[in-house]
């Protein structure tokens, strides 16, 4: 092998090594920042790493919303039809937030309570987020509840 060929081979190997390292770093960063959607049943069953950040999806249980006067601290429960999980947040809730509506909350589990740092609510009476509709559909089929097809956007 001539010196020119050897030098080219070294550069090619260095380029491959650098691109492999960059790919691995990007994959690790994305994995740390990804937040999977779970239902209350999956959380209570232990399908979620207690230390990880994730999204909780379901319906706000009617009669569960509580916010002390003059406080941003809100407490409510989310259900998927099988189980209920208490949620607390100190953030401003969206205008469309209401009991009996679909929500997706992002946060962490602490002492059996989901502490949300973001709460998203549906934006009209027909809309349910696709991931929530799919997971709620499983609970509906399990309990023989007729499933109405939500408008998915």
Swiss-Prot record:
Membrane found in the keyword field: yes
Spans within the Periplasmic topological domain: 30-153
Compartments in which it is found: Cell inner membrane
One example of a Gene Ontology biological process annotation: cytochrome complex assembly
Sequence intervals crossing the membrane: 9-29
Main location as per UniProt: membrane
Membrane topology label: Single-pass type II membrane protein
Superkingdom of origin organism: Bacteria
GO molecular function terms attached to this record: heme binding; metal ion binding
Record keywords, A-Z: Cell inner membrane, Cell membrane, Cytochrome c-type biogenesis, Heme, Iron, Membrane, Metal-binding, Signal-anchor, Transmembrane, Transmembrane helix
Family membership: Belongs to the CcmE/CycJ family.
HAMAP family referenced in this protein's UniProt entry, alphabetically: CcmE (MF_01959)
Chain's role: Heme chaperone required for the biogenesis of c-type cytochromes. Transiently binds heme delivered by CcmC and transfers the heme to apo-cytochromes in a process facilitated by CcmF and CcmH.
This protein's name: Cytochrome c-type biogenesis protein CcmE
Lineage of the species this protein comes from: Bacteria, Pseudomonadati, Pseudomonadota, Gammaproteobacteria, Lysobacterales
């Amino acid at each position: 092998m001539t010196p020119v060929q050897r030098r080219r081979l070294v550069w090619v190997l260095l380029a491959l090594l650098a691109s492999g390292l960059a790919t691995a770093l990007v994959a690790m960063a994305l994995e740390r920042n990804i937040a999977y959607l779970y239902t209350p049943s999956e959380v209570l069953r232990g399908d979620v790493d207690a230390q990880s950040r994730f999204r909780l999806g379901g319906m706000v249980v009617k009669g569960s919303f509580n916010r002390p006067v003059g406080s941003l601290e809100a407490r409510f429960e989310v259900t998927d039809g099988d189980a209920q999980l208490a949620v607390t947040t100190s953030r401003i809730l969206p205008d469309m937030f209401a009991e009996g509506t679909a929500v997706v909350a992002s946060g962490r589990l602490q002492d059996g309570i989901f502490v949300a740092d973001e709460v998203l609510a549906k934006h009209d009476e027909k809309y349910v987020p696709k991931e929530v509709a799919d997971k709620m559909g499983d609970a509906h089929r399990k309990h023989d509840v007729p499933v109405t097809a939500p408008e998915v956007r």
